[in-house]
């Protein structure tokens, strides 16, 4: 009613609720589809094990799990480490990565400090997830290396970060935010080069440290 819609395309369980049995969550998701309030259902920030269980619970209702929305980017690779993409592929579930640009870190905006016109400067430690304390020397070193790699590829850092995600056929799409049309146009150009050399991938794996940016780690670790 508040949205003024008769139904939504996708209804998400946005993260694990330890106080609610998964059977109850699955039932609520299934009811949303069966009552015509949602066309499909998805989950977000679920571990591979919880994802598998949700797939099986929804099957009992004859409802497919359409999509998983994990936080995933070059500085936040819990999806790789956990094997989540394999779980999704094995069950025919799509993946839409949110925070693909690490809330702006992977745009190059913070390479030389915190700009005065940035959200981090305006809100400081109030920002959900991205705070000044995350501009560690390790993260800054990773950003500098990524910036150099992007230049060598003829891309902006943001474009390369999106390309890195979309090169994997198991990643259906990425969820980006843009405050200006120019940002959207720049991001879309990431599709022009989704190919990475073996050397580039090895360099990323060896030298880019995990930035500890998993926004809902408490959920995805369960």
Specify the residue positions occupied by each region the protein language model found.
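Active-site groove signature of glycoside hydrolases
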Residues: 1-20
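Short coil/turn segments at secondary-structure boundaries
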Residues: 216-221
């Amino acid at each position: 009613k508040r949205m003024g819609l008769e139904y939504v395309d996708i209804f998400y369980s946005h993260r694990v609720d330890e106080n609610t049995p998964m059977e109850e969550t699955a039932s609520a998701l299934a009811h949303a589809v069966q009552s015509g309030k949602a066309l499909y259902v998805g989950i977000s920030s679920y571990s591979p094990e919880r994802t598998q269980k949700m797939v099986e619970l929804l099957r009992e209702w004859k409802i497919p799990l359409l999509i998983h929305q994990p936080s995933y980017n070059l500085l936040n690779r819990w999806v790789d480490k956990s094997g989540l993409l394999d779980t999704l592929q094995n069950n025919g579930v799509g993946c839409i990565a949110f925070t693909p640009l690490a809330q702006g870190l992977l745009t190059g905006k913070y390479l030389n400090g915190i700009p005065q016109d940035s959200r981090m400067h305006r809100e400081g430690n109030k920002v959900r997830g991205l705070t000044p304390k995350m501009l560690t020397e390790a993260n800054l070193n990773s950003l500098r290396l990524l910036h150099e790699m992007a230049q060598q590829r003829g891309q902006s850092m943001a474009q390369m970060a999106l390309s890195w995600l979309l090169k994997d056929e198991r990643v259906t799409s990425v969820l980006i935010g843009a405050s200006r049309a120019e940002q959207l146009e720049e991001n879309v150009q990431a599709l022009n080069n989704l190919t990475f050399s073996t050397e580039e991938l090895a360099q990323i794996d060896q030298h880019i440290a995990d930035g500890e940016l998993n926004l809902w780690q408490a959920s995805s670790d369960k």
